[in-house]
């Protein structure tokens, strides 16, 4: 019998970055446990961690490429697959030009070094403006507000949960999400610690979520009105002279404009809009201002709504007004060991962030951070004319489940001339592909959370080497992406990928040696490249990024600093300390100051103000739809693993008892939910955890499409809530509106199923 060995690695399935101890017997995964010695998670783990074993054993996980022949996806060699890509992609590019090909990058890409480090070369080789990602059905409003205020899209202040005394949470459920735009394992333990040290946790949410149940208090709020509430809190702080930004006042522009914008949003003006009494709003404001250390934190419920950017902006306005921005126990800027733009070069001045540099062809929606709103992808495919999308590349994404008006996108994708997907499953989206290129399983890939450490409450660095060898003939994921780039660049399926990898690292080195303030400023690029040795691929890039990062050894400048070699010798990670104040150096705005009221955001305030006098969604008696997170799900990509779908049906319509009685709904019965975009039927769950007038359906389900090859997911199909989502967007960011959707709800008398979209 083979000897058992234990491998330590970071879990790649959510933002918490928990350390795991994976016991192997040869190629068999024996067990997955929490790593008690991990410097960040200290043994904490959640059920998703078991996905490492179950994904390894999943017979539906693709291990060989698929090519469409005679209408069917069949196994092919890697050479045949790339030849098919070269022919199909080349044809679309040749006939329609660069913008005829669109790219969609899904959420799992953020957890994998291949897409994180090599996605940019692919996008540059394609040269298309039709770039889409899960960001515009998720966090884009926060990136836009942070970028415009502080100068970089990932300069997102995160709550210093380990040192705060008062945490106000809106539209977030970190006990289930494990923290989002907030990397901090064991959020339950961290929130409990706030209360144990005499602090307070306040949750504002249309659902009494698991986090709300652990909080000191919970307030229901009408979906989509968070910005009204936040403005009212700002109004109280200013009117009662409770605002005290402290040292940050000398680093900020337009404080007077913020006061002017907040003036109409009195507690009395907004109480009917948001459903929270004026006296309660005043108390929330006074307690926030009175706490020794306080932070405001908001997440997906506030970003996937009509006023997502305004709500995201106002969170940081409140942190500023209360003197808690960039302060211990407040909301602070993380300092990552690698790949963080706001820690490279010299602050506080920089180029800042521009949005709307180009517009989508059909609806004229503006670009954000180099991509277009995915809510417009269907119309870009379906609408004839110059620049019509005729080809699609998807990487680790399932947009036919994850994006709004999914029915329209499903119809549009069927008309494409060519589609290629990098994915481990034939799912609702990839079943339409002409070529599917499987990525290796997580245990066969190196791992470093280059993206998520930029949002972590402590500066942590943890490298995970591959546990398993790649199957014979299987390329690395980064090699697959580079070969797609070479094909897009016209070099064909047999291009020299090693040369592409060299180009990537040489570009990074060249940029860094020319960067004022870099530890290798002015050094010889050849010397730096030689110092990286024989490493290739992500290992070489991460080694380089860590060495030139804020804790790095700087290629000899600080012999005690970090390198990949040091990380390899530290299997439980290296803790580099808590967050620290970083203003003004963290700023990258052209002014070198905090822009408290960016014009792009201030211009959207009249739209919000108009709702003070109007009726607003949900104020006329109609039902309003919201989503919900689930601990054993991560969007649409964990549902083929038995351990994560076992138990009772989780894809239900949650409804308040008063509404259930009025609508004639029964526990365990079926409800038909319809919107302007579509209709579905799902099981009813009656609970007083939901606000009256609101219904909730989790996202990421609906796995009953013909052609899917995910047997477990199909047996627990659920319904796709995005059939109900319109193509409406938050104006400044282009983010989809997935919460606060007006719907009609009625009893149904048929089995739970997704019904064809009506739009």
Language-model-derived ranges and their functions:
Residues 1-240, 254, 269, 277, ...:
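N-terminal export/assembly segments and adjacent metallocofactor-ligating motifs
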Residues 30, 131, 244-245, 281, ...:
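Acidic/polar loop patches that form or flank catalytic/metal-binding clefts of enzymes
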Residues 116-192, 199-204, 228-231, 317-431, ...:
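Extended redox/cofactor-interaction regions of prokaryotic respiratory oxidoreductases
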Residues 172-173, 214-215, 264-268, 297-302, ...:
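Flexible glycine/proline-enriched surface loops and loop-helix/loop-strand junctions
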Residues 233, 251-374:
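Active-site phosphate/pyrophosphate-binding segments
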Residues 434:
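Catalytic, metal-anchored helix/loop core of enzyme active sites in primary metabolism
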Residues 443-470, 480-485, 490:
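Glycine/threonine-rich phosphate-binding loop and adjacent beta-strand/alpha-helix elements that clamp
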Residues 467-554, 636-654, 658-759:
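Long, contiguous, secondary-structure-rich segments that constitute the structural scaffold
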């Amino acid at each position: 019998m083979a000897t058992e060995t234990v491998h330590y690695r970071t879990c790649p399935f959510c933002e918490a970055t928990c350390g795991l101890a994976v016991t192997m017997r040869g190629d068999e995964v024996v067990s997955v446990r929490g790593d008690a010695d991990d410097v960040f998670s200290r043994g904490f783990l959640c059920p998703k961690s078991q996905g490492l074993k179950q994904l390894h054993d999943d017979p539906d996980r693709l291990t060989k490429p698929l090519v469409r022949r005679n209408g069917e996806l069949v196994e092919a060699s890697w050479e045949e697959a790339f030849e098919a890509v070269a022919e199909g992609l080349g044809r679309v590019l040749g006939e329609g030009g660069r913008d005829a090909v669109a790219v969609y990058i899904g959420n799992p890409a953020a957890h994998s070094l291949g897409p994180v480090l090599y996605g940019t070369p692919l996008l540059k080789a394609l040269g298309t403006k039709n770039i889409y990602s899960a960001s515009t059905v998720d966090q884009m409003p926060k990136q836009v507000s942070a970028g415009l205020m502080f100068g970089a899209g990932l300069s997102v202040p995160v709550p210093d949960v380990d040192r705060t005394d008062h945490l106000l949470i809106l539209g977030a459920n970190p006990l289930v999400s494990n923290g989002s735009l907030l990397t901090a394992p064991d959020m339950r333990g961290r929130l409990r610690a706030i209360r144990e040290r005499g602090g307070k946790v306040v949750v504002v949410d249309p659902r009494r979520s698991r986090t709300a149940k652990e909080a000191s208090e919970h307030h229901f709020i009408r979906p989509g009105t968070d910005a009204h509430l936040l403005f009212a809190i700002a109004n109280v702080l200013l009117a009662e002279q409770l605002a005290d930004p402290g040292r940050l006042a000398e680093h900020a522009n337009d404080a007077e404009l913020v006061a002017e914008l907040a003036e109409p949003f009195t507690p009395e003006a907004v109480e009917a809009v948001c459903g929270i009494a004026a006296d309660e709003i005043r108390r929330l404001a006074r307690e926030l201002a009175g706490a020794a250390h306080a932070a405001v934190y908001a997440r997906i419920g506030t970003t996937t709504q009509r006023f997502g950017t305004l709500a995201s902006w106002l969170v940081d306005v409140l942190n500023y007004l209360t003197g808690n921005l960039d302060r211990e126990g407040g909301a602070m800027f993380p300092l990552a060991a690698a790949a963080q733009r706001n820690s490279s070069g010299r602050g506080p001045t920089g180029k800042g962030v521009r949005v709307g540099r180009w517009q989508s062809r059909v609806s004229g929606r503006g670009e954000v951070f180099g991509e277009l709103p995915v809510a417009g992808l269907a119309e870009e495919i379906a609408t004839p004319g110059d620049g019509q999308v005729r080809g699609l590349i998807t990487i680790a994404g399932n947009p036919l489940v994850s994006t709004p008006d999914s029915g329209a996108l499903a119809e549009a994708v069927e008309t494409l001339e060519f589609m290629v997907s990098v994915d481990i499953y034939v799912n609702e989206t990839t079943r339409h592909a002409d070529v599917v290129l499987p990525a290796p399983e997580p245990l066969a890939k190196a791992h470093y959370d280059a993206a998520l450490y930029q949002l972590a409450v402590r500066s942590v660095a943890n490298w995970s080497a591959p546990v398993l060898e790649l199957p014979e003939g299987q390329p690395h994921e980064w090699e697959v992406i580079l070969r797609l780039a070479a094909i897009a660049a016209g070099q064909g399926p047999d291009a020299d990928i090693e040369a592409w990898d060299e180009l990537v690292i040489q570009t990074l080195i060249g940029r860094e040696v020319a960067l004022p303030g870099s530890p290798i400023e002015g050094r010889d690029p050849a010397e730096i490249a030689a110092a990286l040795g024989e490493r290739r691929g992500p290992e070489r890039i991460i080694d380089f990024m860590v060495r030139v990062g804020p804790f790095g050894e700087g290629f000899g400048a600080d012999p005690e600093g970090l390198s990949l070699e040091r990380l390899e010798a530290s299997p439980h990670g290296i803790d580099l300390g808590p967050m620290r104040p970083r203003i003004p150096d963290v700023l990258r705005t052209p002014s070198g100051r905090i822009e408290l009221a960016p014009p792009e955001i201030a211009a959207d305030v009249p739209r919000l103000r108009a709702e003070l006098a109007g009726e607003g969604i949900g104020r006329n008696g109609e039902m309003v739809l919201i989503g919900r997170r689930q601990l054993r799900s991560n969007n649409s990509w964990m549902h083929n693993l038995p351990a994560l779908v076992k138990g009772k049906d989780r894809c239900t319509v949650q409804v308040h008892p008063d509404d259930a009685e009025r609508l004639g709904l029964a526990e365990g019965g079926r409800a038909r939910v319809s919107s302007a975009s579509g209709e579905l039927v799902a099981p009813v769950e009656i609970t007083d955890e939901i606000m009256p007038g609101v219904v909730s359906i989790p996202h990421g389900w609906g796995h009953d499409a013909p052609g899917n090859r995910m047997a477990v997911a199909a047996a627990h199909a659920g319904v796709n809530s995005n059939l109900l989502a319109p193509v409406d967007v938050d104006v400044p960011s282009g983010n989809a509106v997935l919460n606060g959707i007006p719907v009609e709800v009625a009893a149904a008398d048929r089995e739970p199923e997704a019904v064809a979209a009506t739009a």
